[in-house]
C-alpha cells in the first residue's frame, strides 16, 4: 500500500486518506503492477516486453480478472508484478509506468502535503521506493524537494534508533 504523512517531531499527521489500491495507492507495488498488466493486456507495451511478461507469468485474461475481482487480496496479487517492472526498468515503456506512478503520487499526495505543511523535506519508506530510488531522486530534484532518506524496511530504521521507551 501507500500512505503519505507529515512528521511534526512528535506524531505522524496524515491529513490525506489512503484510498486503497483501487482508488489510489499511487506508486505502490499494487499500483505499478496494475499499470503493467493494463499495458500488457491492452497491448500498449512492446511485444518483447509482453512476451517476457507471459514467460514470467503465464496467466490468461480470464485468470487475471478472476484474481482481481473475485478472489481475496487482489492488491497483493497485483503487487507481485511490480518486480517485473523493476527488473526491466531500463526499458522505456517501464520507465513510463514508473514515471507516471511517481508523478501521480506527487500530484495527488506529496505536493498538497508540502503546501499544507510548508515543507520541502521528504523521505520514502518501503521496498518499491528502495528499488526505484534513482527515479525518486530525479523526481524530488524536479519537484525541488529536499530528499532526506529512502528506507527499504521501516524496522531496519527503527532498530538503529533508541527504542528504549516504554509503551
Residue ranges of predicted features:
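Short beta-strand scaffold segments in enzyme catalytic cores
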Residues: 1-8
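ATP-binding/phosphotransfer module of carbohydrate and carboxylate kinases, centering on a glycine-rich
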Residues: 38-167
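Fold-independent oxyanion-binding glycine-rich loops
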Residues: 1, 18-19, 127
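Glycine-rich phosphate-binding loop plus the immediately following alpha-helix
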Residues: 12-57
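Intrinsically disordered, low-complexity regions enriched in small/polar residues
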Residues: 8-9, 59
Amino acid at each position: 500500500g501507500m500512505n503519505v504523512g507529515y512528521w511534526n517531531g512528535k506524531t505522524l499527521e496524515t491529513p490525506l486518506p489512503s484510498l486503497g489500491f483501487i482508488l489510489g495507492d499511487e506508486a505502490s507495488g499494487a499500483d505499478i503492477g496494475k499499470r503493467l498488466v493494463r499495458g500488457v493486456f491492452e497491448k500498449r507495451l512492446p511485444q518483447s516486453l509482453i512476451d517476457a511478461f507471459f514467460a514470467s507469468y503465464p496467466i490468461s485474461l480470464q485468470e487475471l480478472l478472476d484474481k482481481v475481482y473475485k478472489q481475496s487480496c487482489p492488491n497483493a496479487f497485483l503487487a507481485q508484478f511490480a518486480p517485473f517492472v523493476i527488473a526491466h526498468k531500463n526499458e522505456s515503456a517501464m520507465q513510463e509506468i514508473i514515471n507516471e506512478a511517481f508523478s501521480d503520487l506527487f500530484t495527488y499526495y506529496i505536493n498538497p502535503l508540502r503546501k499544507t505543511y510548508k515543507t520541502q523535506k521528504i523521505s520514502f519508506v518501503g521496498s518499491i521506493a528502495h528499488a526505484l530510488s534513482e527515479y525518486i531522486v530525479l523526481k524530488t530534484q524536479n519537484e525541488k524537494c529536499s530528499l532526506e532518506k529512502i528506507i527499504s524496511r521501516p524496522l531496519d530504521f527503527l532498530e538503529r534508533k533508541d527504542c528504549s521507551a516504554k509503551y
